[in-house]
Design a protein with these regions (language model features):
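ALDH superfamily catalytic-core signature
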Residues: 1-77, 106, 140
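Conserved C-terminal structural/oligomerization subdomain of aldehyde/semialdehyde dehydrogenase
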Residues: 14-18, 60, 67-182
């Protein structure tokens, strides 16, 4: 099952159109800078040096700018930098697991906690799993959706507090206390 899933992820990633984000058929645009692209590529290369398997991508594309072929890594272990660090680039790290408890424990074994997603046909079960993730934003069958009325923010080294929605109003207010002792 794992190999079939990974093959599907690889096929999807290899079918993505990387290009001008203003073009309707584009799936992914460039990174924010050439430096950001080079950092992401270096993290992929370091993961491979440490024993991970690069299934596709992870290289600079031959055009001016911060373009990168999206990557898929497998075989990343807890000892590797790719497990411990955030990769700010188009890199999917796919893990195998034997039980839901193991998957949740693996997902929560991080210094970070911005967001996570659970995908499945049984949305009730997926929601139960999503509630166990130690993240600021947990999604079921989607990832990264933001709307003005939804809180945005993480936990641990991914931040504290929330932006947007009623939770974010306090970020833009200067509350003053005047207390008179009697």
């Amino acid at each position: 099952m794992f190999d079939d899933f990974v093959n599907g992820v690889v096929a999807t990633v290899e079918g993505m159109k990387v290009g001008n984000p203003d073009d309707e058929g584009t799936d992914m645009g460039p990174l924010s800078s050439v430096e950001a692209r080079d950092d992401a590529i270096a993290q992929v290369e370091r993961a491979v040096e440490q024993g991970a398997t690069l299934r596709t991508g992870g290289t600079a594309l031959e055009q001016d700018g911060a373009w990168m072929a999206p990557a898929v890594l497998t075989g990343v272990t807890r000892e590797m930098d790719a497990f411990k660090e955030e990769i700010f680039g188009p890199v999917a790290v796919v893990y195998s697991y034997d039980s839901i408890d193991e998957a949740v424990e693996l997902a929560n074994d991080s210094s970070f906690g911005l967001s996570g997603s659970v995908w499945g046909k049984d949305t009730d079960k997926a929601e139960q799993i999503a509630r166990r993730l130690e993240v600021g934003m947990a999604y079921v069958n989607e990832h990264g959706t933001t709307k003005a009325g939804l809180p945005f923010g993480g936990v641990r080294r991914s931040g504290y507090g929330r932006e947007l929605g009623r939770w974010g109003f306090g970020e833009f207010a200067n509350t003053k206390l005047v207390r008179v002792a009697k």
